[in-house]
């Protein structure tokens, strides 16, 4: 059992997925090109790698019980049954107690990868039963270098995006590649600086809500389209092919 710790932007969830991909792939992630297994793990479609995440304040006890049941199953196609729990610090003590035995004595075929902002955010009973990996937030220069090497943005744009994102790679990439996001951010800063009356704050809040709704809808559509494209690529389906019932 492993506990991967790092503040927002450090890539702890991506680290967990990459680790899982290396464990499951026949080449252990050493090939120049990613294997099919690696692609499936990173895309979230591998049958033996399960990710527990939540957008709620806490992770429910029923969710943990369900994933424990999954952990007890033998892997179907790979060497390991891997369970990734994002934001394990969101578990209440009662929920954590349900998980303790599995973490302390996992099944021979199962590996647990837990993620949290820091080891101090996790109950001592979890910390003492895991191997801890601490990640650091990348520097502004490192993030800017990543953006220029993986996107088509100019160095000046990459540098500004990295500085504003304060080391958070995901946010920096969004700033660098989506002009509307950067424009909305600049508009917000100017709006706050120009607030003079309570009515100004109300108008600004209304604009922020409208922009957030539009951005959320656009992001959801983009993510859905990307996931479908990746799913089709992994399963050898052309964009115009119908998805067979067995793959749905």
What positions do the PLM features span?
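Active-site-adjacent scaffolding segments
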Residues: 46-49, 110-113, 132
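Conserved adenine-binding aromatic site and its adjacent loop/helix in ATP-hydrolyzing domains
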Residues: 69, 101, 124, 128
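Clamp-loader machinery-focused feature within the broader ASCE/P-loop NTPase space
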Residues: 1-94
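Charged, glycine-rich active-site and insertion segments that engage polyanionic ligands
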Residues: 1-22, 28-40, 109, 117-248
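A generic secondary-structure signal
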Residues: 70-74, 102, 146-150
């Amino acid at each position: 059992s492993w506990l991967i710790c790092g503040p927002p932007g450090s890539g702890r969830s991506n680290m967990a997925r990459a680790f899982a991909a290396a464990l499951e792939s026949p080449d252990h992630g050493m090939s120049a090109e990613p294997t099919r297994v690696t692609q499936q793990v990173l895309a979230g479609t591998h049958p033996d790698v399960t990710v527990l995440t939540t957008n709620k304040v806490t992770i429910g006890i029923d969710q943990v019980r369900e994933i424990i049941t999954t952990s007890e199953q033998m892997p179907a196609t790979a060497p390991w049954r891997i369970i990734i729990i994002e934001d394990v610090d969101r578990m209440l003590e009662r929920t954590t107690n349900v998980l303790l035995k599995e973490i302390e004595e996992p099944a021979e075929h199962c590996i647990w990868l837990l993620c949290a902002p820091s080891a101090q955010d996790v109950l001592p009973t979890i910390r003492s039963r895991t191997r801890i990996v601490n990640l650091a937030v990348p520097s502004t220069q490192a993030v800017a270098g990543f953006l220029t090497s993986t996107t088509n943005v100019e160095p000046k744009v990459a540098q500004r995006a990295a500085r504003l994102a304060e080391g958070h790679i995901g946010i920096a990439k969004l700033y660098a590649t989506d002009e509307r996001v950067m424009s909305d951010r600049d508009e917000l800063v100017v709006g706050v600086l120009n607030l003079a009356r309570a009515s100004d704050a109300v108008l600004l809040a209304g604009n922020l809500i409208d922009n957030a709704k539009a951005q959320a809808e656009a992001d959801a559509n983009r993510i859905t389209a990307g996931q479908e494209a990746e799913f089709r690529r992994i399963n050898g389906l052309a964009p115009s092919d119908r998805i067979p019932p067995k793959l749905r």
